[in-house]
Design a protein with these regions (language model features):
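Alpha-helical solenoid repeat scaffolds
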Residues: 1-157
Length: 157
């Protein structure tokens, strides 16, 4: 298959596997990626699988790839699972004005955004929860309806 599949195809497959959270398959195909992309997807794989060396893996990602929406998402999810609310908010604020297309998978971003918003509501930080809920970048579908409803529920009088 080497003559039919080029590095762009491998990058697309790696991106698909990463967004689908198939980190074991992603890990097995890292060797087919160009060096810079290998560093990016290795960091994503480590974040997804809760492996050791997260900081080291992220440090190896080239600067121009550190703003990759997938890496940002995996970092958000990793921080959110560990209860790091303020650093989760930092990532959400940094990605607040991106379009649905720039987010790649805004539906998955919404799940993390919703989780952070609920934590904020629990902590009685209603205005911040509303801000986080309303900046969802969705335009249609069930997640859009939920995001719009959640944002409306968080409005303070």
């Amino acid at each position: 298959f080497k003559k039919f599949i080029d590095s762009d195809d491998h990058i697309k497959r790696a991106d698909y596997l990463a967004w689908e959270r198939k980190y074991w398959d992603l890990k097995r195909m890292l060797k087919y990626l160009p060096t810079d992309q290998r560093a990016l997807y290795n960091a994503r794989q480590i974040l997804m699988s809760n492996s050791y060396g997260v900081d080291n893996a992220i440090a190896k990602v080239p600067q121009y790839l550190k703003k990759d929406p997938g890496l940002e998402f995996d970092r958000l999810r990793w921080r959110n699972r560990r209860g790091r609310l303020e650093s989760s908010l930092e990532i959400l604020y940094k990605n607040a004005n991106k379009t649905e297309r720039q987010m790649i998978r805004p539906d998955l971003w919404w799940e993390q955004r919703k989780s952070v918003a609920r934590t904020l509501i629990y902590k009685k930080r209603y205005k911040t929860a509303y801000k986080i809920s309303s900046e969802h970048s969705l335009s249609s579908g069930p997640s859009f309806a939920e995001a719009e409803t959640t944002g409306a529920d968080n409005k303070t009088p």
